[in-house]
Amino acid sequence: MDAEYTVLYFWDPECGHCKKTTPKLETLYQEKFKDRNVEIFSVGKAVGEDFEKWKKFIRDNNMTFINVAVTDNLYNEAQDNSNGQEKLMKLLQTTTLASLNYQNTYDIFSTPKVFVLDKDKKIIAKSISISQLEEMIDRLQGKEELPKLFPPDPEEDAQMQKKE
């Protein structure tokens, strides 16, 4: 992704807070970010039976930004040594085993989680709410004067800071 800022959004189709946050993020993307060189890269939980729930959640929430998931199949195949590492080597051309296990690698033990990356893909913010995300991107792009779609919400801010 060649964007000035990239938002990483980690979510779970069964997460109650994700069901509230996702529509806000989609609105923010459509009404502010899409035309301002800000991309959203969404990583959903899609293991086991969650794969169908993941696809349905994307459809139901009209998620137009990039959506990916690591499935049980993909992770298990990457660890499988019986195929002479052929599949693993092909996969490692684009990713790592650590990134497939993103929950441990990136400390994602509760959802939703929002990270912001700069143009060099360095993390400049993590575990922020949608209102904090909007304020931050507006400020970074010198657009503080724009009306806010999502005013600060202390409950949402506290939820995004949770570790579990």
Regions found by a protein language model. Name each.
Residues 1, 35, 107-110:
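Extracellular/periplasmic catalytic domains that process cell-envelope and extracellular macromolecules
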Residues 67-70, 127:
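Short acidic-hydrophobic, aromatic-tinged amphipathic segments that line or gate anion-handling sites
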Residues 143-164:
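Non-globular targeting/processing and membrane-anchoring segments
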